[in-house]
Amino acid sequence: MNRRHFLTTTAGSLALAGLSHAQSKSFRGIIHKAVKVGTAPDEKHFQRVKDLGFDGIEGNAPGLQVEPMKKVCAQLDLPMHGVVYSKHWQVRLSDRNPEVREKSRNGLAQAMRDAKAVGGTSVLLVPGKVTGEQENHQHVWDRSIEQIQQLLPLAEELNIHILIETVWNGFCYKPEQFRDYIDACDSPWVQAYFDIGNMQRFAPSHEWIRILGKRTLKLDIKDWGSKNGFCPLGQGDVDWKKVRNELEKIEFSGWATREGNDGGVDKTAKLMNELLAL
């Protein structure tokens, strides 16, 4: 081998080694990928999800078909890690009417019981919606916290976390606000369910992750771009490398659930593996 060939080969090897080192952090076994499935079991679809390497699923409640879902999940060894509270938009904890707030709280309690029954650990909750003078930002903050705190004994009894998600509802559009809201709930049972794509519109997703820190217990996986809105993973403005870096810094471990469409669950599996280093 001549000197020129040696130097070229060595430089190439060093570059590959550097790339390998830069990509060496893997979240395999640390982040568990899942998809959302609704309220009814679909054994064929669940089997495909399992075959594609997903670690679990997330359902909706109330209305979850608890016993049939438990049976299929057990047969396939595909756990349901939690549920989304399906009524939080229509029947809100922040509604101006106290009777509606009570109804929403009771529905959330049922969702918590359903989550426990299927072996889950959490309920995803949107705490309210800013609609006007009778339901402004402060109303959403105060009313939702009042209702959530009434459910803290149940959360502890069931060992179920109430995980707050920020969406395009006029509430907590700054990561510092969301952090402070979680802290105002004043309970280890109330933490963050951070949606990576939802909040990219208001501040880079990796900044949200950094500011929320260890308050984030679970992730919704989405992408969003200023030109194309919600889109397949990897086609928006989310900087996935920076997202991974911040997740590593906060020592995140837990569930990451895809919400959205990538043209097939097989493509979703591949994209999640690539973008989350699974």
Label the predicted regions.
Residues F46-Q47, K71, R113, P153, ...:
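Alpha-helical segments flanking ligand/cofactor-binding loops in enzyme cores
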Residues P68-Q75, Q147-L154, K242-E246:
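Catalytic-core regions built around general acid/base machinery
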